[in-house]
């Protein structure tokens, strides 16, 4: 009898977990379905071949903790697909975006990568995944099966060297780190630098790179006074901040996303209102302003995409994005937008979706997008010019 | 700096204490560790955000409504998932695992409806602070302590001075005998879940206001650490929950100061393991209770 009851309760639990998984999955499923029907009607109007669409996979966290990034990628990708479809599609075929939800977990990403490579005759390439660690578990699967992967966000140095089919439309962190240190030392004139970093592969690696750069500037009187590693999303950073402040830091480089920068700025300014806070381009998002409020005024960081740019093509893109999704695009979403554009342009130039030819074309491509002129080097990395941005009165402005 | 770290630790600990109270309430009556409590706490903060910021109902009505709704969520959880298990006479482990499942469901529902991003939560008490012996205590920290103590006094009053409290204690001692005396044990349990939900909502609102941040997954780590606090204080004991929370909060602050931020999150769980080995009943726990 007891065993029976146990079995029943286990079943119930399994059913519940399954339910939770389903409800999470169905959310993403319906958006994908909606998207497809939307683009189909566009296809009917322009007389494109929608029976043989070119499918581009967007694999990123659509649910869970980092879903805002994945949804941003998917939104940007759909916008780019719409742009192509309005102009007759790619190779006269309709462009379709297929979303995959990896929940920013390496395990899920592996399953998704295997699913994508099993359908590689239909899928022209993958835009994703989101975090460097997840990208690096999925990348070998894509490489082995000759599927093109362009990550709009991975910045770990080792990512793109995994293979020829692996690209990134984001600067390597060593270059961006140099730009952040440059802001702290040359633009703000700070000598005593502290680091606060999240305990992920990316965070630890980035803080190591920053340390190395600071080490090389010792002769200029620049000094690393303290380095604190914190758990991502622990919300309370006051203890680490008390240590940094005690060590006499004049500027703090925050190795983390907006969800680290905003609370650190708030909690640090309660202790020391004069602290200078420097971040990275992945903190460039309107959520930083919403979450940080007054405290993030004065936070500086280098970006390769700046939404308030004077350039007409960027203005048009930002307007279209804002109109469609109700908020200005973040830097990473914009990099996803360009990634889709580059992949489709390469396919158009080659006249075929054969991944080997498209890959070769990508290495030759000179793409002028909203995130600047992009050209992949031989490992699949990009080198872009940085714009230094700061926050003034609750708005992002260029640094003078 | 030591003093500042102690103040930080006390504020952090008060947060854990407020959540730990909810664990203790439910454990006291059901002998069940309710792992869905962390997500209920996140629900309280998120729903308060909806009332205060999106619907502009004002701070006090917003908090009260969120306490009411979160209390109802507690009742729903019991009604939908735990009561059927009790009726079937399932072993305690089944209820325990069920609460973990519920926790996932609540968190994912919040993500589906409100999104996973971290949002700004209004700070109620301003940023003014009092300088004390070289450290700074903020108004928010003081109010957190005051409100937590008031909440605890109210809970103690309910449990020891009211009729429903008498019924709660009776059900706790012997559910079968209580039922024979005409106590509606299921109602008492639902009431307990309601109280736990109310205290979780208050904890969520205060902590979200302190850090000025709110997001669906905020209950996961906080819930686990509050569980350690509840075990340290003696699970089932209300003053124990408060003391346990304060100790865990301060231990974390001290760990950051002397060992580095890297060790911070492990401290709560090291304490949990040590307590379970050295003093399984916790600081205030009664002896001889059969644990789940």
Residue ranges and their predicted role:
Chain A
Residues 1-7, 11-12:
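Positively charged n-region of N-terminal signal peptides that target proteins for export
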Residues 18-21:
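C-terminal motif of bacterial Sec signal peptides marking the signal peptidase cleavage site
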Residues 2-4, 23-400:
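Extracytosolic ligand-binding ectodomains
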Residues 11-14, 399-400:
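In a subset of proteins, long, contiguous C-terminal domains/tails are tracked
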């Amino acid at each position: 009898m007891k065993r029976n009851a146990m079995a029943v309760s286990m079943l119930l639990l399994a059913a519940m977990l399954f339910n939770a998984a389903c409800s999470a999955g169905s959310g993403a499923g319906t958006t994908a379905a909606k998207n497809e029907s939307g683009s189909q009607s566009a296809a009917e109007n322009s007389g494109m071949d929608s029976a043989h669409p070119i499918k581009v996979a967007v694999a990123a966290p659509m649910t869970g903790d980092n879903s805002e990034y994945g949804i941003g990628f998917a939104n940007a990708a759909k916008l780019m697909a719409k742009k192509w479809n309005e102009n007759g599609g790619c190779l006269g075929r309709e462009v379709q975006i297929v979303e995959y939800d990896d929940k920013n977990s390496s395990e899920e990403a592996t399953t998704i990568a295997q699913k994508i490579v099993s359908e590689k005759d239909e899928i022209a390439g993958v835009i994703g995944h989101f975090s460097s660690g997840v990208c690096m578990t999925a990348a070998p699967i894509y490489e082995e099966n000759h599927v093109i992967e362009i990550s709009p966000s991975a910045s770990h140095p080792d990512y793109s060297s995994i293979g020829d089919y692996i690209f990134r439309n984001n600067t390597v962190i060593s270059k961006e780190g140099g730009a952040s240190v440059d802001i702290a030392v040359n633009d703000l004139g700070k000598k005593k630098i502290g680091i606060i970093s999240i305990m992920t592969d990316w965070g630890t690696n980035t803080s190591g790179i920053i340390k190395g750069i600071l080490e090389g500037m010792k002769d200029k009187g620049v000094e690393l006074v303290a380095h604190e590693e914190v758990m991502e999303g622990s919300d309370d950073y006051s203890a680490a901040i008390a240590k940094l402040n005690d060590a006499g830091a004049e500027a703090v480089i925050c190795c983390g996303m907006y969800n680290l920068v905003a609370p650190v700025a708030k909690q640090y300014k309660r202790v020391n209102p004069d602290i200078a806070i420097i971040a990275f381009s992945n903190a460039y998002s309107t959520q930083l302003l919403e979450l940080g409020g007054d405290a993030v005024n004065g936070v500086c960081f280098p970006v390769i995409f700046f939404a308030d740019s004077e350039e007409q093509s960027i203005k048009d893109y930002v307007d279209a994005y804002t109109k469609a999704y109700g908020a200005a695009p973040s830097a990473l979403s914009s990099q996803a937008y360009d990634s889709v554009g580059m992949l489709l342009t390469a396919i158009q130039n080659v006249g075929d979706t054969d991944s080997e030819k498209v890959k070769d074309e990508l290495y030759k491509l000179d793409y002028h997008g909203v995130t600047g002129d992009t050209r992949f080097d031989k490992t699949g990395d990009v080198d872009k010019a940085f714009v230094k941005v700061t926050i003034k009165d609750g708005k992002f402005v260029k640094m003078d | 700096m030591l003093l500042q770290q102690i103040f930080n630790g006390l504020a952090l600990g008060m947060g854990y204490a407020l959540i730990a109270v909810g664990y203790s309430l439910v454990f006291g009556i059901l002998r069940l560790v309710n792992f869905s409590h962390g997500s209920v706490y996140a629900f309280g903060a998120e729903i308060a955000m909806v009332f205060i910021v999106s619907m502009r109902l004002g701070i006090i009505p917003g908090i009260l409504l969120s306490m009411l709704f979160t209390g109802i969520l507690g009742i729903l959880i019991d009604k939908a998932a735990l009561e059927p298990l009790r009726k079937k006479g399932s072993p305690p482990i089944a209820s325990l695992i069920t609460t973990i499942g519920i926790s996932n469901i609540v968190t994912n529902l919040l993500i589906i409806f409100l999104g996973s991003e971290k949002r700004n939560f209004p700070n109620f008490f301003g940023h003014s602070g009092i300088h004390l012996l070289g450290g700074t205590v903020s108004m928010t920290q003081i109010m957190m302590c005051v409100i937590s103590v008031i909440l605890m006094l109210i809970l103690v009053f309910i449990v020891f001075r009211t009729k429903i409290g008498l019924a709660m204690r009776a059900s706790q001692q012997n559910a079968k005998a209580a039922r024979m005396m005409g106590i509606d044990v299921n109602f008492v349990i639902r009431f307990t879940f309601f109280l736990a939900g109310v205290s979780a909502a208050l904890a969520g609102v205060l902590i979200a206001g302190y850090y000025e941040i709110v997001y669906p997954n905020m209950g996961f780590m906080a819930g686990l650490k509050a569980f350690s606090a509840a075990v340290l204080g003696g699970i089932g004991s209300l003053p124990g929950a408060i003391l346990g929370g304060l100790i865990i909060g301060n231990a974390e602050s001290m760990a950051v100061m002397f060992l580095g931020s890297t060790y911070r999150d492990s401290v709560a769980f090291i304490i949990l393991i040590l307590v379970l080995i050295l003093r399984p009943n916790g600081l205030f726990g009664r002896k001889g209770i059969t644990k789940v």
